[in-house]
Amino acid sequence: MSASSTDSTEIHISGIARDSIVDGEGIRLTVFTQGCPRRCPGCHNPDTQPLVGGRMTTVGAVLAELDENPLLTGLTLSGGEPFLQPAALLPLARGAHARGLDVWSYTGYTLEELRAQENPAVDALLDELDVLVDGDYREEERDLTLHFRGSRNQRVIDLAATRATGTLRLLYKDE
């Protein structure tokens, strides 16, 4: 894919998993963003919580990693809290879609909390996502049998179907 002006956009990350099968359907490249204000007890990624630490990378560098693995079916944004840097992640999500990949994101916020922010960058990122796994992790609701989430309060929202129907659509709704 050709370089674009957004390739130099910086993203603060903790790390990258290059061939994840646990962060969404298929084989995924997962970007773990750095920084999360939620501090959920029992957090799966506590090292991603501090706003300091991690490293800076660029959208272009992550897109190049997507290009290196023809087996990938998607990109997952995790954390940390991806919605602390929605403007930086938007061109990454668009670049993944341009490559024919689906895009999932995890967040400690609910979809309703994110929409209530009335933040154009948050709204634009939500509009670009295919799936959102929302809600804070709750140790008392932990359930290892759930698909792609750790506690029963979390939802796996099919945002593409939600946009198409105007009604909230969940994946794995029978769990």
Which positions does each model-derived feature cover?
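N-terminal [4Fe-4S]-dependent radical SAM core
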Residues: 1-32, 41, 45-51, 168-169, ...
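P-loop/Walker A phosphate-binding loop and immediately adjacent motor/lid segment at beta-alpha junctions
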Residues: 85-97, 104, 142-175
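Short glycine-rich anion-binding loops that position phosphate/pyrophosphate groups of nucleotides
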Residues: 82, 137-138
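Conserved C-terminal portion of the radical SAM core fold
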Residues: 69-77, 133-136, 163-175
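Conserved Radical SAM active-site core
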Residues: 8-14, 27, 45-125
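Receiver (REC) domain switch/active-site residues of two-component response regulators
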Residues: 130
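Residues at the C-termini of beta-strands that transition into short coil/loop
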Residues: 17, 136, 160
